[in-house]
């Protein structure tokens, strides 16, 4: 029985993970649940899943949870950064679902990697920010990292067994691979008039045509920054060059990504757009378990279509690709700026089209020396956030 820690337990990925656990309760034990401030949701899932530990990042939320939890459950409530890092490194823990959104998830995800855990990586920002440091930590500790993002999980499933064992140091050309084809739906504004994008609301941006996701990733999907971050993540996970990575718009979200081989073959992974499928795959790899997802009905799908991305419509995607070419400093800055600009948009402070403007300004103006430690990364992240906040204030 695997002992599981879920980072970001009250979020969308956390809920899907617990759903898969429920379908396979004889194989998994929830050792700990980790959340930030959502006490009501944490209380609900603690009562249902009975973890040994419930960790709240917010100290006030931890106090409130401790007060509300029935004492007979004997769940230990903890808070604090050191306690969280100790929790993911605990000898009793086998697997860590890394699903805290954004830069906030980097320290705990990296701690799990350094502890040699089986890490189910849903926090793409960890690789976007720490890249080489992350890969080096994984190789040094012997940690197993499995990609949860549907696209990267699809790519992983399309690789040979040998290449699957070489995450972070894959030799794609040696495996006969010519291109990784990263698919994306194009989001809710794919067919909107360009002139209307500046007036799009947070509610419209969060109404994804195919996926049910949290607010931040929904806005990122609307701008295709999410695909840009996934492009950067794919670069590190699969040791891919810019020439080996291509983005393909696929509005139906049925093909989750593809791998093109030298001999002309293209292998694709298909399925209904439901995160429980890649989560179940990662949790059980190399075996297969039930995810609770309905099988794909090809007769209902009807057609599959593909488009080249329009960078005039999706400038954030172009920025991310350029940042990936420039290196770690650029991707760290872009990620930080995007978190600030998206939050400002969600709060009604800026227009949807201002997200790309702020991201580009930050990308061009915030610079740093080489990043050799996690402290270097977090310092640059903080610097980029401050610049982006100032840019937001100028646009209000």
UniProtKB/Swiss-Prot annotation:
Cofactor dependence: Mg(2+); Mn(2+)
One GO MF term attached to the UniProt entry: 1-deoxy-D-xylulose-5-phosphate reductoisomerase activity
Matching Gene3D superfamilies: 1.10.1740.10, NAD(P)-binding Rossmann-like Domain
EC number(s) reported in the record: 1.1.1.267
GO biological process, one term: isopentenyl diphosphate biosynthetic process, methylerythritol 4-phosphate pathway involved in terpenoid biosynthetic process
Enzyme class, UniProt record, top EC level: oxidoreductase
One family name in Pfam for this protein: DXPR_C
Positions contributing to Mn(2+) binding: 149, 151, 230
Pathway: Isoprenoid biosynthesis; isopentenyl diphosphate biosynthesis via DXP pathway; isopentenyl diphosphate from 1-deoxy-D-xylulose 5-phosphate: step 1/6
Entry's family note: Belongs to the DXR family.
Function: Catalyzes the NADPH-dependent rearrangement and reduction of 1-deoxy-D-xylulose-5-phosphate (DXP) to 2-C-methyl-D-erythritol 4-phosphate (MEP).
NCBIfam families: Dxr, PRK05447.1-1, PRK12464.1
Name of this chain's protein: 1-deoxy-D-xylulose 5-phosphate reductoisomerase
GN (gene name): dxr
